[in-house]
Amino acid sequence: MKRKIIVACGGAVATSTMAAEEIKELCQSHNIPVELIQCRVNEIETYMDGVHLICTTARVDRSFGDIPLVHGMPFVSGVGIEALQNKILTILQG
């Protein structure tokens, strides 16, 4: 089953693209089929139907119901990337 993931940032361009590429490669290397949706943080609710994970590169001080939310800045900075990858895999494989 395809896992639907929202990747969001302030402008839906630079940092979300970096995070989306990292997530895509991570999932491909673990044979997890994904559908990635890039958007602005303020557009997340528009795309939430059937979503398994939300990854934001901007700070978000709220929750989205039962959908897990991870902070994707390690994909941009490189700091803490392995821990984030493990967290994402745990969520998607669980």
UniProtKB/Swiss-Prot annotation:
Single GO BP term: galactitol metabolic process
Record keywords: Cytoplasm, Galactitol metabolism, Phosphoprotein, Phosphotransferase system, Sugar transport, Transferase, Transport
CDD domains assigned to the protein according to its UniProt record, in alphabetical order: PTS_IIB_galactitol
Main location: cytoplasm
Induction comment: Constitutively expressed.
Residue ranges occupied by any PTS EIIB type-2 domain in the UniProt entry: 1-94
PROSITE patterns found in the cross-reference section: PTS_EIIB_TYPE_2
Domain notes: The EIIB domain is phosphorylated by phospho-EIIA on a cysteinyl or histidyl residue, depending on the transported sugar. Then, it transfers the phosphoryl group to the sugar substrate concomitantly with the sugar uptake processed by the EIIC domain.
Database matches in NCBIfam families: PRK10310.1 (NF007643)
Protein name: PTS system galactitol-specific EIIB component
Species whose genome carries this gene: Escherichia coli O6:H1 (strain CFT073 / ATCC 700928 / UPEC)
Higher taxonomy: Bacteria, Pseudomonadati, Pseudomonadota, Gammaproteobacteria, Enterobacterales
Gene name, Swiss-Prot/TrEMBL: gatB
